[in-house]
Amino acid sequence: MVALYLWPVYHPFIGWPPGRPLNADRPPYWLQVNHHFFFVLYSFVAMGILTVFEWDMFFPDLLDAFVLTTLPIRNSRLFLARVAAIAIFILGFLLDANFLAPLVIPASFDPPNLTRLLAGHILAVLGSGLFSAAFILALQGVLLSLLGERLFRRLSLILQGLTISALLMLLLLFPVLSGAVPVFLQSDSRAVLFFPPFWFLGIYQRILDGPGALPIYTRLTETGCLALLITLGVAGLAYPLAYLSRTRQLVVGSGTQDTRSWAAGPANGLLNATLLRSPVSRAVFHFISQTLMRVQRYRIYLVLYGGVGLSVVVSSILRLSVEHGRVQMEVSADVVRASIAIVAFWTIAGLRMAFVSPGNRQGSWVFRIVHGRPPVAATAIEQLRAARTWVLLWSTLISLSACLGARSIGSAELRSWASTASLMLIALGMCLVLTDVFFFNGMTIAFTGDTPRGQPNLALTVLKYFTFFPFVIWIPVEFELWIARSILHFALAAGVIGAAHFGLDRLHRGMVKEHCGMPGLEDDDEDFPMRLGLRY
């Protein structure tokens, strides 16, 4: 798609690109370099995210130990089969993610030397993606070999979240970074040699420009080739050691450990005495907490959404400007205000994605036996309210922390007490209303819903996010200054938030009562008519 978009940039026609004559020359040199840089960066980010997402699949799990080790297959053959599977997976996705661009680039770029362009493009994007995947695999192997399984498990989620955030930040910051690329590459700073995407951009331009390439491209090419070889070597040496460590841990076992927290007792006691006064709400609330701590799949969802949110926040706040040949960073007050809504939105969206995933239905039989299915309306309301309380508490804690962080890096106008109070009110209101909106149609306890039979409409899902997300960001940017202007405005904003919450809560109660009034299904009943929305 990007290659198709670039066609009118190199071949202008009437009206597009705006303000560019039909007989215009080729784009400036550094603009062409930025176009090449995007493909290198895309391959780097895509392969990195894919490798992080499949982090746990590169090593055997308990099911592999129970099933495969009982077969008459040598351990060395099992190891080589997994290595081959990893290689096929990485190389297959690397080709799949990049094979379309070389088919379109010749027509879009209309290069003077097609052979050099295709050779530079293919080698650069393949090397960039391969380095990204190999680096993450090598990092995982080294840490697992040195730290052991138990300590590695404690750090893996943090590493996954930070890695995804960093990779997405690179991609989202490309429009900002592209303006500074000429300054970086024309400077004599050695910092350029420590940025991996520049290495493979150097390979691209060194092959494309030939002997007339800038000297920096030769240095970047040498650094990139050496780094790729070292990374592949480290991954090849560390993976067998990590594989043996993981296999030994599966056979011997990791032992028992006390997972209780010294701070959980007083916190749970305070919650039970205030927000969770009924046994039903306590059961659901603590069921959610324990399930998230126990099931790896849900934590991966939270890591992915957290990484997306953090990358969007950082890429929105950070601005690079070039003045007098130097790159400077700037922070906009409006973007700092919008970051509060971004954090709240992606936190609650990630929790909803985890809650509706039917990955722990084994625990649903307890609620069904005790309360029935569907339960009486009052019980169902308590169950769903406990889940929303859990989401509200954590999203509020994260959003208020982001609010204080935004205040510390913002301009002087954001550090006044009136502005701080308005930002905190917006953060609390966003968490309250977004929790009501995201969980408005929820009728089941978290993690216990049925597996959907049909595939969701991806286009419709993306459209919902693209239409709702900008509106959420617009609210704090538009109303923060108005709220901070006077106490009356603050009170009016709080009243609007409260009215929206109580209105959504009342509508949700009505939907829950209607749902609970429908006849339930037994295990041996034919449930197809029920899935059509019909009742008999």
PLM features per residue range, with description:
Residues 144, 362-377:
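Helix-loop-helix connectors at the membrane interface of multi-pass transporters/channels
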Residues 73-77, 257-264, 372-373:
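Membrane-cytosol interface motif
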